[in-house]
Amino acid sequence: MVIFRRAIVLVLLLSALVVGRASAGFAPPALKGTPQFVISGHGWGHAVGMGQWGAYGYAQHGFTYDKILAHYYPGTVLSTTTVKSIRVLLANTKSVTISSTGPWKLKDGSAATTTMPAGKVTLNPELKFKLPDGTEAETFTGPLTFTAAAPLVFKKPYRGTFTVTSDGKKITLVNTVPLEQYLYAVVPSEMPKTWLPEALKTQAVAARSYALAVRKASGPFDVYDDTRSQVYGGVNAESPTTTAAVDATVGGVLTYGGKIALTYFFSTSGGRTAAINDVWKSAPVPYLVSVADPYDSLSPYHDWGPLAFTPAKLKTVLKVPGRLLDVQTTVNGSQRVDSVRAIGEKGEHVLTGAEVRTALGLRSTWFSVGVLALDPLPATTLQYGTSFRLTGLGRALPDLRLEQRSPGTAEWVVKRDVEIDDDGSFSVAVKAAAPEEFRVTSGTIATPSTKLVVAPRVALKVSGDLTTLKGSVRPVLPGTPVQIQHQNATTGRWGTVSKVDATRMGRFAWTPQLLDGTYRARVIARGGWAVGLSKKVFVG
């Protein structure tokens, strides 16, 4: 079962959903910008059964352990088991070293008993070893059972007895321990020992029930000592608070239809648990359904993210052909992600939510994929005051804002909120007011910026008496030099015939006698402006 603060690792053999290449009718979305992908989610763990943080919240609100269990496992009955002991696999390896701090006994497969002094022995598949006093022992016939008054030690101390068997290649070490003493070491390994008594009692019953529901009574051992079953920390893990919770619920198990209930548990639901058939594609189980988890908000993992991923990272993980353009999800009845569809320029690929969770190291399958992209502006020059639109995609992300900054400055300034259409796209009307960079943000997530190239709007006309060229520059840029240019009628080339400065009102004039021909005004402004040109004016 789940170790607290760590999601359970379950290996699920799910059928692969493969769409690895473009089909004849495939059409990638018309997205020009580089998308930023943001994943946010809720909860930690598989979400089936009891949420530990939610149980803690119920305890804080005065619920007793039986009421808490009834909420998470609806329809179950609190009963009492007659099982007294359990066998825990500690090792399956080529060699183990075990020890005792006091005298201990060895009984072999022939029922012969050997008393040994305090010390350690190292066993190999031949079951031949030296006794703690250095005496060369004979080869024993397995299985070997070690007992002592003090806890036996394999890396750490354990209650109960050790049994060693060999298949000729590896030896198996199993700890047989009274069921309640097993729970003394499990409950504090799965839930913080400082939590309220009713939460710890809830954990004790869930752990006891789970152990008996999954035990392999016909095999060489019943349960593993790690997350494949439940974490069993030995004597060192025990705590007075959790021991008291075990003792207060001694023998207590949940049953359904007269059978021990399979009481999965996990860290954090995010606000709602999941039905077993939504998580592992198994048959529905009446007491493992999706239920509200209102007090789960206490958990630091109730909500998580946003986690930003580059297109390159997701492209590799999601195995999409071509540049990654979009990621879409489908969810099941428990609000968990069933499938993830990655869309690239050359095709798409579909994975399960569980596969994506594992590949990206997410806390749960209750997540959403936000996509944020801003289409780059074309590399053309717009005149001051021209209207244009900024377009892009901003799906499944909160509080989108358009930001801008001026050339030479580091600070981004919020220009306006961005409204999203039903399909996640946006189109924002903007006027070219100055050379600027734009980006769209959601919290700390930002698109790559796009530059707006703007030229001053320059107007030029000739006076009625044909003696003066006059005009204006917008926006007003006082002191900006204006070049008056004349076009050579033969070559078509432009030559500057005069330079004047724009006034504080943005106006300029040139009064020398005019030659016949075509004129224009050319403005080169500082501050990142593009060259501004007036329309041509003909004098003649």
What are these regions (language model features)?
Residues 415-417, 496-499, 511:
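Residue-level detector of high-confidence beta-strand sites
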Residues 428-429, 509-512:
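Signal that preferentially marks extracellular ectodomain short beta-strand elements
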Residues 408-410, 490-494:
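Short aromatic-acidic-glycine turn motif
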Residues 434-438, 480, 515-519:
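Exposed beta-strand face motif in extracellular beta-rich ectodomains
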Residues 2-465, 475, 483, 504, ...:
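Conserved, single-site charged/polar hotspot
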Residues 468:
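Glycan-association/targeting regions that enable binding to alpha-glucans and other polysaccharides
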